[in-house]
């Protein structure tokens, strides 16, 4: 019997985006089902299917269509629907929702079809929740606000916790809500507010519900990334209600907390709206002088957005209201799969695959994997062997992607990366020691996972040693190549055909950095372009991959400038800024503007460079950015130069 069909296919979501257990399961099951099956340390006994298949040279929908065409059709429909919502494309959205196939949600009479009894392999409640939410957005875009509110309430109720409920014990009740369910509640509350602008009793009720969610999400030990993602939306709506009810003072604390979270954890999608709201709060209370810092931050962020619009012609989220921004946040990226019992149907006997039910260990071990038996079908019909052949994996050799074997290890890895990003080298080194001990304690399952964990630790120690100037650039280059060689042959001419994990892309970027430091700019460009070409050709939308693309964009912008190729440099500056802001981040925008300013100074466009440096100096105050001191020095030097030339 062959084991672990999942190989490089299923596990990526765990590691690549540092997904906490409740994030991983969001979109697969309800929170109550998660608690039933998976309470504990990363005790996932069913894994998502949409993050998987790059190593096969096909995207996930290709693979799903091969395994279960019904699922492929649904996911294709859902992705088109979400795209239409984000683009406010009501013509396409109506066509998708009123289609006469099994994926249309609205029947010929204009009513929501009850499709819980169907042949889908996925959780029907989650499918219906998404579909009805989409119908509510169509109603909203076409101006039927009351109908939009009615439909979104119905969507909320598909997973059992409606926003009209009064929670006697909110800790007990609301802990069952996943991120997506919370977002659905917020959307419903937003429509409730819009439909009851003159109804104080309704506003009181909605405000109370939002207050419960605020206390729950920020005071329940929830993963900080979940808090950062959702708190600004809940807070904004809650504060808006308090202002409408004449209790502006009750909005000060959540509004300040929201701004603090976004600045600390690099989230920009709600930043401008929240800063405006805080300024309005202070004006309503007659103490606008206390909002001077927020006014300065707002002006700085508007300068960044104005700069991007001047360069590229448009700005992400421009003219988007609250609902549209909520629907662009990362919560909705969760995939629409199924409970642990149902997902096995995706692997039903098609092309020779048969299934064994996932074994659930008594202690919910992460070593539980999908067990797939080879069938007695003809070899060319054997799907498992087909995958192995396409991957080039010899029989008996397992090459699963890394995932941490305990929640503690997962958190340590996240803390290490943050410490290194903040140049807290001693702290990172100490955390690496703890991670090594935790991996030994928890066990990683097999030799390959041990190798990949070893690669992460080796790369981290190499970076720390180089940052601390304990090794030379040439020594660091040699160590990087040896570290990468544990899993990837970088000299392979077909490297663009190989699947590269996020960690491997990061090591490639480290190699590019060293070549740059050694003065070999052409080699630096070559390695940075490996990362860009890989991600762009696959249209990868994972935030972890986007982060690596941003590093590569900035590297290429700087390198092409060094090679006096200013047009190419400008192109990567525009791409980098747009990607950073459209992904909901924003911190690196100042870095790209700094690169632009430096280029303009090189071209003797001194006034343009001076203005850009001023934008950088102001913008660095928002999220914090290491370019501020350099920008101040360059601004002062350039200003003195301009003044001396004038005299």
PLM segments and residue spans:
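Amphipathic alpha-helical repeat scaffolds of TPR domains
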Residues: 72-82, 124-141, 173-198, 228-240, ...
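Short alpha-helical DNA-recognition segment
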Residues: 16-36, 351-371
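DNA major-groove recognition helix of helix-turn-helix/homeodomain DNA-binding modules
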Residues: 47-62, 380-398, 643
